[in-house]
Design a protein with these regions (language model features):
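Active-site-proximal alpha-helical
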Residues: 26, 141-200
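Active-site recognition of the HExxH zinc-binding catalytic motif
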Residues: 89-102, 115-119, 172, 180
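Secondary-structure boundary/capping residues
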Residues: 35-36, 127-130, 184
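Generic structural signal for hydrophobic core residues of well-folded globular domains
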Residues: 99, 103, 121-125, 175-179, ...
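Post-HExxH zinc-binding segment in Zn-dependent metallohydrolases
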Residues: 108-151, 201
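Juxtacatalytic substrate-recognition/specificity segment
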Residues: 1-110, 125, 139-142, 162, ...
């Protein structure tokens, strides 16, 4: 179900097509289930910010409320440069959060892995390029593991927020390389029943 202003009808149709195709492509790992997924294409920046109060204005282009099966996204017209390609990426990213909540226990899954899986599946690789992560290391900006989850819960300064995402994706891709495709998904789906440290062992 895609809610939208009349002027955003073409974006709503595009969103439905992107989400339908993506959901089918990941259904063997993360089935959507019987509950509907609701999408709100925000008609204005102010309307979007009402839903994104915990973020700085312009800090994110989409957000998910997995327990409600809801995602709220900015259409390309509310993105810098028109961002049509980014629109599809945002839709896929937010859908992954909803699918993870339906297939694992959110409370057992670290926030960094939740974000990392969302970026991995939506192919947001640029944020954690080897050069970007190396720069973080050289500048002493690597976030200690014990603090990483909190960086997603209390988004503040823009650079630290972006660093948290880059680090999450880098760690997730490392896990994927080490464990392989099947091992990685066995780990993720084990989080239905056990906390991450136990699943990792």
């Amino acid at each position: 179900v895609v809610a939208h202003a009349p002027e955003d009808e073409s974006h709503a149709r595009a969103a439905l097509a992107v989400l339908t195709e993506f959901a089918q492509s990941v259904a063997h790992r993360l089935p959507v289930g019987d509950a509907p997924v609701r999408v709100l294409v925000a008609p204005t920046a102010a309307e979007f910010q009402k839903h994104a109060r915990s973020f700085l204005p312009g800090q994110v282009s989409g957000l998910a409320r997995p327990s409600e099966g809801l995602m709220v996204v900015r259409p390309p017209t509310l993105r810098a440069g028109g961002g049509a390609g980014d629109f599809g990426t945002t839709l896929r990213h937010e859908l992954v959060h909803i699918l993870l909540a339906r297939n694992v226990d959110d409370a057992l899954m670290p926030n960094w892995l939740n974000e990392g899986v969302a970026m991995h599946l939506s192919r947001e690789y640029q944020i954690a390029s080897p050069v970007a992560v190396a720069q973080m290391f050289l500048e002493g900006r690597i976030i200690p593991y014990r603090d990483l989850d909190m960086a997603f819960m209390t988004p503040g300064e823009e650079r630290e927020f972006n660093d948290a995402y880059a680090q999450a994706l880098s760690m997730t891709r490392h896990l994927h390389r080490r464990l392989g495709e099947e091992g990685f998904w066995a780990l993720v789906l084990a989080l239905r029943d056990m906390p991450f440290p136990d699943a990792l062992h």
